[in-house]
UniProtKB/Swiss-Prot annotation:
GO terms for biological process: catabolic process. Pfam families: BenE (PF03594). Keywords: Aromatic hydrocarbons catabolism, Cell membrane, Membrane, Transmembrane, Transmembrane helix, Transport. The keyword Transmembrane applies. The gene is benE. The lineage of its organism: Bacteria, Pseudomonadati, Pseudomonadota, Gammaproteobacteria, Moraxellales. It is a multi-pass membrane protein. Disulfide bonds: none annotated. It comes from Acinetobacter baylyi (strain ATCC 33305 / BD413 / ADP1). GO terms for cellular component: plasma membrane. This is Benzoate membrane transport protein.
Amino acid sequence: MTTLLKTLKQDWSLSATIAGFLAVLISYSGPLIIFFQAAQKAHVSTEMMISWIWAISIGAAVTGIFLSIRFKTPVVTAWSAPGTALLVTLFPNISLNEAVAAYITAAIVIFLVGITGYFDKLLKWIPQGIAAGMMAGILFQFGLGLFLATDTLPLIVFSMLLCYLISRRFSPRYCMLWVLICGVAFSFFLGKMNPVPLDFQIARPQFIAPEWSWFSTLNLALPLILVSLTGQFLPGMAILKLSGYNTPAKPIIAAASLASLFAAFAGGITIVLASITATLCMGKDAHELKDKRYIAGIANGLFYVLGGVFAGSIVALFSLLPKELVAALAGLALLGAIASNIKIAMQEDQQRDPALITFLATVSGMHFLGLSSVFWGMCIGMLAYFILLKPKAS
């Protein structure tokens, strides 16, 4: 333990801590809104809503900290945002107890997929250009969001963009910190902060008994398994691979699904490997040295602990920020990741067409057969890859 603490102290950096904080900030300011919508549809109490947030925050914290320390890799976990969107469409046709049962079913199935090793084999089968095209497509909307935010709060967004350019030139390591300070300062002085009452209190998790039904299993558990594996773990592992980390999928999926199992009883949806926010912790902005970026994963987990303990209060605090500031912050923070993934996708001449098809299908937002554009981008891109590049029979 003493050796571990000494190593953590030596490797700690402010830039990695900021990267971890920004990942939590974006998670709470974006996907968490879907949770509020689901809670309203389910007509749950404020106490139950806080329990949900406590469960997903602590679940993401424990897995992220453990895996980041274990593999010295910036492993960032979160809750399934696509799965949460499913809840909005299903409530109030299913009860909260049925939803919890579906979470448990999904966690068990995902755990079995992880420990059998089949997911690792699937990951090795996907070419780097296809994975990069998919990731660029996922992140592209955030780059667009940066400039779309100028429609409503142009002064704040353009000031953040200018601050980004200046700090990238003179203080690149703490660039995003200056951008955050700039955005908050302009929002405050222009009176654009959201009027949210702050009341700091400790969260108390609520136990929810599961109630199995075929309806919730087929309409929530099964889609949750698919979107978690194809829309979260798959791009999440692809990001790790593209960032130069060869962490196996088996322990990550196993740890996340076990955390999901326990979080479910407090109302927490499936814990998954983060894809979008993970890029914040894996680039040079987190740390110049790749081997020291794991601190960002640990910092991310620690901020999630704070978010879980003060669930209601922390969410209210993040809710102060205007959505345009959050959109601009996310877009600027992910510019480097967007550029690097587009570069990798277009790097090899042979893979360029399949990678471009993957990118366009992913960024399209298509939902054919109810499955996400991430899934279809990967499938269509792989189909193009095998048709165009498979050796012809002599």
